[in-house]
């Protein structure tokens, strides 16, 4: 099915939906914290073969990583190689809701960041304490010296702008901003968020490959009705277990806090993704009151299903979403970290010498893309 992927300076609703209809999550093309894909060339082969166009979570830092100069240079080199394979690829980077003191404190603030906020440049690194959200424990994200940034604080605004700008310079044309409601706890009218997003968009209008950047976040409730900040919404799937059918799940409207909630008045296209967030204390046991799927996060659950059921489920969820939401799309799992197991990540690649650990879901994804 031929689709239009052309844009420059702005993006039409049609082209945006075309990209989202070909979205995958593929971590590690750039740095994924301090690791990266060890099957890079086969990953690019797979993405091209599938017909993927929007490559989600291609680069990000959650907590610790290599120094930023090295990380951004690495991303720039790899994304340039990706654009040799397909110049229409959109690579997405993430600036998340977790900050880690040692990483933040060794990251210099470039002069252009001060200037973007009307400040005199200083020779210093970012300040963890000047951007953290008050009232949280020092291990809020499950490891010491982590915190949530507070978007009402200028230092946090500079941090988000800086990271987005550097990823844009590296070749990214999409930025995911994480749990914006949590980061914006003290910004109920999203005044500070809008200021930061406006700065990112102005930077992209000059420096991005096609003079535009797609911006999304994990949005909740009323924010999904807002049409001023984000290009599209994104959220985990929120799988509902079938208790009498081990390891099987379905989608259901208004289940927990899922995106599938017509009362939220979705005014923009959206993606649902196979999220990663760990596993429960009772893996393999259903609990309909939790966000886990049979005790696992969504991508780990998917990776543990057999090949036939994975094929069945990808087709099922694609049809279920498309039948109910004309502008709703499933972000196909391509490469994402797992909770436990012998391998750090799930890979959809067809198993071969180039990717001996692949789950061989590549052709299923290609088939889904080919009919939607």
Can you annotate each of these PLM segments?
Residues 1-372:
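Glycan-processing catalytic domains of CAZymes
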